Amino acid sequence: MDEIDIGLFDRDWNNTLYYFILNADEQIYLRYGGRDSKAPDSYLDLNSLERALEKGLELHQQYREGKLPKRERPKALFPREIPLLVERTLARSACVECHLIGDFQNLQREQAGTLDKLKHLYRSPDLTTLGIHLDVPKGLVVKDASGAVRAAGVQAGDRISALNGLAVWTFGDLQYELDRISRDAKSVRLSVERGSEIHEFAIELPERWWWTDLTFRQWSVEPRVYFDSRPLSEAEKVQRALNKSGFASEVTHVDMFAEMMKSHQLRVGDVIIAIDGVDQDAVANTAELYIKLRKSAGSTVTLNVLRGGQRMEMPLKTYRLSFRK
């Protein structure tokens, strides 16, 4: 990737396979690839790839005939412009491998104070959070609609054709455009083909619609906490006389790493009430999410914990991963 324009070929770099269908004028017709947090190949299929390639040829013919408007070329960006990536690769006469790019971009942003964790860590929001379940071999045909999209009127059999007015031809296109939506957005416009008609729906985005499991990404900038938790319901908070708007959460799993490294002394069933005295956040609904969003990897925090009806404080040391090839 040493001389590749990663500004033009912009994507979520934590993908196993990713294709760009483009022409000699560097006009990208469509993308093919993408994944979810469950598996690297959830949306990869030979039939859908064939459909994508056929659509690419169709769009190319339209472009040659002047029927497809030319898009503005993205600003160029090369690996040599990311100092920490250069230090890790080019300065050591090593290759810039694609899986290094996203992590070192985030390290560079962290150093520069421009890291937006909602945008840069929680990449490629999951379509199923919106209620979109695709018939993968058929590309963007909806197999089942639930949640927000069903409430808006999307039906099984619809073919998704645009997001916020931008044409999408593949899962890769749709995921890429969804990833570009501001995490503060409350709604998006989804266009679908239904028979011979085009329908547009206003989709109300669920709370924390951008959240995904980060485990497979192995971000260096993500504080590793080595426990899982679930948010308490409002009734559970009232029962324990806790802040109804707070992020109090019950520990559901403690990783063996925490026990081995003694990074914290949490137990399953503990309720984390606050972090460093803070019990409420505009975004986070659990203690672990609060730490990931508001603390730096490698920092130590003080937990306010409720255990068996008794309140206590304990330290928790987060860990920073060193990116491994």
Question: Where are the language model's segments positioned?
Answer:
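PDZ-domain C-terminal substructure recognizer with occasional recognition of PDZ-binding tails
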Residues: 161, 177-214, 264-267, 273, ...
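Post-cleavage N-terminal segment of exported redox proteins
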Residues: 32-88
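PDZ/PDZ-like domain segments forming the peptide/carboxylate-binding groove
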Residues: 123-162, 166-169, 223-274, 278-281
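A short, hydrophobic beta-strand/beta-hairpin element that forms part of a small beta-sheet core
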Residues: 15-35
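Short Cys/His-rich "knuckle" micro-motifs
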Residues: 105-109
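The canonical Cys-X-X-Cys-His
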Residues: 91-102
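Thiol-based oxidoreductase modules, predominantly thioredoxin-like and allied folds used
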Residues: 1-4
